[in-house]
Amino acid sequence: MDPNPFIYCTCCDCCKLGQPKLIKTPYPLPKHPTGKFKPVLPPPISKEHNSLLSQPGKSTVSPRDKVQSGNTESSKAPSEVIQVSPGYTLIRNREQISVTLGDEMFNRKKHLESDVLSKVKFSRTDIISDLQEQIAELMAIIEQMNRDQQSALKLLSKDLDLRCSNMKQKFETESRELKETHREELERLENNYKEALKAEKALAEEKLDKMSKEYKYLKSMFHVFQDSIYEEMEDKWLRRKAEWEKDEKMEREKILLQQKCRIIKKFELQSEEKKKKMNESISAVSDNFAREKEELLRQHDEDILQIQELRKSKEILEAELRAQATVLETLNTNLFQCQKELERQKTIAANLEKLFQTKLAEAEEKHKYNIKTPTEENNCLRC
């Protein structure tokens, strides 16, 4: 007789990383002719087996359970020991759940079948509850991902709009400041030029007044000298009066013409110098304005490139969001398929439970019949 009767171990996924798995029992389930699995009950306990199980502290563990216990000891995972009933011990940790049956379990002959049924129901309910918990957690994760994506999209759109508005305001303020500075510089240069022109004009008028005063003074002195020597040289002057007047007139005109030419040349030179200075200042101002304009245009081009890059990044983010939306759709379809699979597993479990109950009833009737026939034979022999 096999010393390991009906040991069943269920591994649960405590970290919720995958579907829970069932470890096979030492007794394989033979196939029914209809294609379904037929549960195998433990064989009846004989006297020899009771004599072998006389020690109360021993527990029957399959080789697979020994390997699992060695793995748990090596990984040093914390385990929880639950005493379900006398002779029925449940050991649970993060990786698996193991069940140990002792001698006290085999002493209960009358309640053996009901205990087996309760174990099977317990394991099935554990599997169903684990699947339901996994589905609930998956739904919560999907909802959290949807909320995170919506909040991230809103934050990115707000940040992009804020950056665009800041850049536009900065460009407008800089262009306004440059226009104001340029206008102020032009006004300042015009005022300086007007003031310089007024000063030069006043200086020229002052020089002209001074020269006219000198000319009048010389003319008056000449008339006084002429009057003083008029009597002495009247005869000479009478003879040479015409020549002298003519020469005087020509000389005066010549002197006036020379002075006029000299003043005109001097004024032309000064005006040319002023024009050169004015042209140089205007060219310098125009060069500065051109450089500032080029810098502004270059900065405007850079701002346009930055705006284009931001638009590209926005398109990339929108593409990523669309990809994540497709992933969410696939997750929803997988969730729907898992729900359908869970319903199908529930129906299969209910059918297996019904089949197990019928087989158990048949086995009980057969066992009663097998007990009844020897008792009748014993009664007949006694009689």
From Swiss-Prot:
Annotated segments matching region Disordered: 26-79
Stored InterPro entries: FLACC1
Organism placement in taxonomy: Eukaryota, Metazoa, Chordata, Craniata, Vertebrata
Coiled-coil residues: 125-220, 276-359
Residues bearing PTM N6-acetyllysine: K354
A single GO cellular-component term on record: outer dense fiber
Name of this protein: Flagellum-associated coiled-coil domain-containing protein 1
Expression (tissue specificity): Isoform 1 is specific to germ cells of the testis and localizes to the principal piece of the sperm flagellum. Isoform 2 seems to be expressed mainly in somatic cells of the testis, and is not detected in mature spermatozoa (at protein level). Isoform 2 may also be expressed weakly in brain.
Start-end of Polar residues biased regions: 51-77
Record keywords, A-Z: Acetylation, Cell projection, Cilium, Coiled coil, Cytoplasm, Flagellum
